[in-house]
Amino acid sequence: MSKEKGKKQERGITLVEAVIVFMVSITVIGYAALSKQFPIAMGILMALILCCGYSMAALHISWDSLFDSITKAISAVLFGLLFCLFVGMVCASWIASGTIPFLFYWGLRLLNPDIFLLVAFVITSICSFLTGQPWALLPSIGLAFMGIGTALGVPAPFAAAAIVSGCFVGDVVSFTNEVPVIASIAAGSNDSVGTIKSTFKPFIPAMIIGVVGFFAISMTMTINTEGVTSADVLMEGLASGFNLNPLTLLPLATIFILVFLKFPILPGVFVASVVGIVEAVLLQGMNWNTVVNMTWSGYVSNTGTASVDALLTRGGIMDFAGTIIMLIFAFSFAGVIKRMGMLNIIMSAAISKVKSTGVLVALTTLTTLIGVSFTGSANVSSMINGSIYKDAYIERRIHPEVLARTMAMNGAWWNAMLPWSASGALCLAVLGVNNFEYTFFMIPFWAALIINIVFAFTGIFTRRLTQEEADALLQNESL
């Protein structure tokens, strides 16, 4: 009884407090990400400790309550953590089986630096739109294109930008992806098909700009001449070190078939990894135990050709251990700030000042990027932003699909640019390029962001509600 009396009453965070904690957290994480003085994971951990300490000392939130929020946040991303483990297996087994070397070899033979960025962007975009599975494409076709680009002497940030832009098209407009669905539900639309159709309006011109932009970069970029010279040496090393039989594409075909059959992606990736292990034994003549060990510790290339060995020594579950630790810290941090109510109070204060449709969509874009940055998830960001903006859009007679497309389109691509988000961490681990090095060159993302805001200011392709429709939606929200 005395303990209950001595326990201080929990209070809500004020706007001033939220802004200060927000800025300090951003500074700590940003310093770690940009200065490279210590790992990003440590910056996130420091911000996590700061927010936990402030929550307990100033807001009187109990540790049990904070820990409950942390466990809920981590459980929500358990799929991503397990997927990273399986991607490590895929990378190692597909290199050992000859799948990745086969794609490297023929990519080097058929492509040249002048068309590489354009081809990488278009092919990954088409595959991602059809499958809706960016995470399956990245460690397969994405990894292959990255290796090809490196060998051709294409600067890594340009290659990564083209690959990531294309691979994550599925998160933006694929009918088989959950990001548009969740954004639609969060916006109060419940019509994901309508949201995707609406998204195509800014998305198509953005993709055209992306095609032109990547082609222009290809024509003007400085090629690493040593990389171009070593392409022939690389092909010789690949041909001598591996059996480049077309059957080595079976693991890749397996994952595509399973995706089209709607087979769950997590066990699907595991099955494709097992197919790679079997092929490594049958086609490459490797020992069974050796291949299985490689899926844990990573593939170590010993072809005798330094350029080949540098490209192919990678993968394995342990190669993703650091990524998984960073994700655990990041989503723990997301759970704590959600419990604090920090983002909600900042966004609610901002929305009260908005007068025009253009400013509202611009603000939604900004808070979507902030939401993804702090939660590490496009879906969680959509749920937070949707709950805050839903009524504001309806009251201004703006159709919920405009809110949904703004959250889904911006959140999906931005998610791939943050090294502490699940998608961004996967990009970093697979491609080996710091996310912030290619962020500026994500041409379709920036184009779509600007076009969507311009549409809102001009009223073009910004669907409106009748007063009756708005009243009906508001009435449903109040039930």
Whereabouts are the PLM-identified features?
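Juxtamembrane and boundary regions of transmembrane helices in multi-pass small-molecule transporters
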Residues: L34-K36, V172-P180, S184-E236, A416-M417, ...
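Membrane-interfacial loop-to-helix junctions in multi-pass transporters
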Residues: S75-G80, Y105-V122, T150-A159, G241-L249, ...
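Hydrophobic mid-bilayer segments of alpha-helices in multi-pass membrane transport proteins
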Residues: T14-V28, Q37-L59, L81-F86, L118, ...
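Hydrophobic alpha-helical transmembrane segments of multi-pass integral membrane proteins
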Residues: L82-V90, N112-A144, A330, L343-I388
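Inter-helical loop and helix-membrane interface segments of multi-pass membrane transporters/permeases
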Residues: E4-Q9, V28-F38, T99-I115, A156-A159, ...
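Core transmembrane alpha-helical segments of multi-pass membrane transporters/permeases
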Residues: A41, L45, S65-P101, D114, ...
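Re-entrant/interfacial helical elements at transmembrane boundaries that shape
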Residues: A136-G147, V164, N177-S189, I345, ...
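Alpha-helical transmembrane segments of multi-pass membrane proteins
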Residues: D114-C127, G153-V169, V173, V359-V372, ...
